[in-house]
Design a protein with these regions (language model features):
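Catalytic-core regions built around general acid/base machinery
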Residues: 45-56, 120-127, 182, 225-228
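Glycine-rich, proline-tolerant flexible connector loops at the mouths of alpha/beta enzymes
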Residues: 31-53, 104-109
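N-terminal substrate-binding region of glycoside hydrolase catalytic domains
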Residues: 21, 25-41, 64-69
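Conserved beta-strand positions in the central sheet of alpha/beta enzyme cores
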Residues: 31, 62-64, 100, 136, ...
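Active-site-proximal loop/turn and secondary-structure-junction residues that shape catalytic pockets
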Residues: 9-11, 34-36, 66-69, 103-107, ...
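Soluble or luminal CAZymes and related metallo-dependent hydrolases
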Residues: 14, 41, 45, 79-83, ...
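Active-site acidic/histidine proton-transfer and metal-coordination neighborhood
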Residues: 16-17, 52-55, 72-165, 175, ...
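Histidine-acidic metal/acid-base catalytic patches
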Residues: 1-26, 54-57, 95, 146-168, ...
Length: 273
C-alpha cells in the first residue's frame, strides 16, 4: 500500500500551496477536492491545475465530488448529474482515474429508494465511463441512505456496473454502524480506494469530524483493519483525510511530515508498507 494525503487535510492552504508543501515533505500520491479545485479555477485553468501536479511529481489517485442525490432518487439529482459530468471531465483532464461521491442523504429514506438505488448507480457509472473513470461510493456514518459497508456492497453488487466500485473510509467504518466482521464480506480486489484515519476513544453518539486523528494517535484497530484489507488484496493508496483545525490551518510541509512519520510506523506494523 502507498501513503497519500487528501486535500481536506490542508484545506486552508489552497490547491497549489497544499500540494507544494506535501511534495516538499516527500509525498507522491494525493487526493484532490472539488472545492479547492474550484477556488484555483477562479484565477487559473484546468490545464494549469494539471501542471501543478506534474511539475511537483505528484500522482492524483482520487478526487472528491460531493453532491446530493447521486446514488438515490431526489429533487437535486438532475442538477447533481450535470455537475457530476463536469467533474468527471475536469478530473479526467487533470489525469485522474477515480472519482468518488459520499452518500450525504439526510432525509427520510424508504424501501423504494433502496430499490431504485442500483439504477441510480448505473446512471452515474455510465457518465464516469464516458471519461474512463471509476466511480466510487463512500458510505458515510451520518447518511440516512448508505451509511454502512454492508449496504454499500449490496447495492453496488446489484447494480453490477463495471465502472462503479466501493471505497472504505476508516472513520465512517469504525465510528458508524459497521462491524469489523463486515470486512469479511469484501471480495478479493473489490475495494477501489481507502481513506485512512484513526479514531478517538469517544462515544459514537458524540463523534464528529474532530474525532478523526492521524493513524496511531487514536483507539481504532487500524493495524487489524489494514491487515484485513491486505488479505482482501487491497494494495492501493491509503489517503489520510483529516479535519482537525490545527492540521487544516497548519503548514502543509510540517503536517505532511508529521503524517508520514506516524502513518509509516503503523503501516510497517501492519506489514503493508
Amino acid at each position: 500500500m502507498t501513503l497519500s494525503i487528501h486535500q481536506n487535510t490542508s484545506r486552508a492552504a489552497g490547491y497549489r500551496k497544499s500540494l507544494e508543501g506535501w511534495a516538499k515533505a516527500g509525498i507522491r500520491f494525493v487526493e484532490v477536492t472539488d472545492v479547492m479545485l474550484d477556488e484555483f479555477l477562479k484565477t487559473d485553468t484546468v490545464a494549469a491545475a494539471k501542471r501543478v501536479l506534474t511539475d511537483l511529481g505528484l500522482t492524483p489517485v482520487s478526487a472528491a465530488a460531493v453532491l446530493p442525490d447521486i446514488w438515490i432518487p431526489g429533487e437535486a439529482r438532475v442538477a447533481s448529474l450535470d455537475t457530476w459530468k463536469r467533474r468527471c471531465d475536469q478530473f479526467s483532464t487533470i489525469g485522474l482515474q477515480k472519482i468518488y461521491c459520499p452518500s450525504i442523504t439526510n432525509r427520510r429514506v424508504t424501501a423504494e429508494d433502496f430499490k431504485a438505488t442500483p439504477a441510480c448507480i448505473r446512471e452515474a457509472g455510465d457518465i464516469a465511463r464516458q471519461f474512463n473513470l471509476t466511480a466510487m461510493i463512500e458510505f458515510a456514518r451520518t447518511s440516512t441512505h448508505l451509511s454502512t459497508l454492508r449496504s454499500t456492497l449490496t447495492v453496488i453488487r446489484e447494480a453490477a456496473h463495471s465502472n462503479v466500485r466501493p471505497m472504505l473510509d476508516f472513520f465512517h467504518f469504525w465510528s458508524g454502524m459497521s462491524k469489523f466482521e463486515d470486512l469479511d464480506m469484501i471480495r478479493s480486489g473489490e475495494i477501489a480506494h481507502v481513506h485512512f484515519q484513526d479514531i478517538l476513544d469517544t462515544p459514537r453518539e458524540l463523534m464528529d469530524n474532530n474525532g478523526r486523528v492521524i493513524p496511531g494517535d487514536g483507539a481504532a484497530p487500524v493495524v487489524a483493519i489494514l491487515r484485513k484489507l491486505a488479505e482482501k488484496a487491497y494494495s492501493g493508496p491509503l489517503s489520510v483525510e483529516l479535519f482537525l483545525m490545527e492540521l487544516q490551518q497548519g503548514d502543509p510541509f510540517e503536517v505532511a511530515s508529521r503524517i508520514t512519520q506516524k502513518c509509516e510506523a503503523v503501516m510497517r506494523k501492519a506489514g503493508v508498507l
